[in-house]
Amino acid sequence: MKVGIIGAMEQEVTLLRDRIENRQTLRLASGEIYTGRLHGVEVALLKSGIGKVSAAMGTTLLLDHCRPDVVINTGSAGGLASTLRVGDIVISDEVRYHDADVTAFGYQPGQMAGCPAAFSADAALIALAERCIIALQLNAVRGLICSGDAFINGAEPLARIRRTFPQVAAVEMEAAAIGHVCHAFQTPFVVVRAISDVADQESHISFDEFLKVAAEQSTLMVEAMLRAMASQ
């Protein structure tokens, strides 16, 4: 099995990249793909860049050039579920855009024309992530992750997202685009992110302070999932 792993930022991929054995680097457009083996599993690790376009472009190149069997999106997210704190984990059951609106034509909020209302994560990958959560004794929430080309900071945008998507667990800037591309390629995916900030009016302050914690926690989860895959 080959596993595609996607992180947007240098801080979100560096721990994994540095542990890849026989690492080779492929530079495509604005992204970088690092291939090799990690914990006995063949991996292709993409540093996509921030935002939906960069994520979609990078995911397309990753799937086309490396042909992974499954994709794990790692990194940080802003927590909206009431039980989430910095360093906790959010696992996607589905992903949606929070900044897409073609409701005038009968679509649901967040639904792109011609697409499903949400992109569903793979049930087997969700179950694997949840087993790793139990083994690592981490706090986690499984639920909806919403993506958009904005860092959510302030009461008004936060209220809009919660009003439109009352079941939302976390927000970030790439997962829905990654899920969209994986859906088109019929590639199973899951999003496993660590909380870097609890979305509120001071999110930008806590994000800068706690990004390192989130990167360490999300890396811990990805490595646990790879070890579990290697033992199957």
UniProtKB/Swiss-Prot annotation:
Active site feature: E12, D197
Keyword NADP part of the UniProt annotation: no
Pfam family, one: PNP_UDP_1
Record GO terms (molecular function): adenosylhomocysteine nucleosidase activity; methylthioadenosine nucleosidase activity
TM helices/strands, residue ranges: none
GO BP: any one term: L-methionine salvage from methylthioadenosine
EC number, as in UniProt: 3.2.2.9
Pathway terms, separated by semicolons: Amino-acid biosynthesis; L-methionine biosynthesis via salvage pathway; S-methyl-5-thio-alpha-D-ribose 1-phosphate from S-methyl-5'-thioadenosine (hydrolase route): step 1/2
Family the UniProt entry places it in: Belongs to the PNP/UDP phosphorylase family. MtnN subfamily.
Function: Catalyzes the irreversible cleavage of the glycosidic bond in both 5'-methylthioadenosine (MTA) and S-adenosylhomocysteine (SAH/AdoHcy) to adenine and the corresponding thioribose, 5'-methylthioribose and S-ribosylhomocysteine, respectively. Also cleaves 5'-deoxyadenosine, a toxic by-product of radical S-adenosylmethionine (SAM) enzymes, into 5-deoxyribose and adenine. Thus, is required for in vivo function of the radical SAM enzymes biotin synthase and lipoic acid synthase, that are inhibited by 5'-deoxyadenosine accumulation.
Subunit structure: Homodimer.
Protein name: 5'-methylthioadenosine/S-adenosylhomocysteine nucleosidase
Organism of provenance: Edwardsiella ictaluri (strain 93-146)
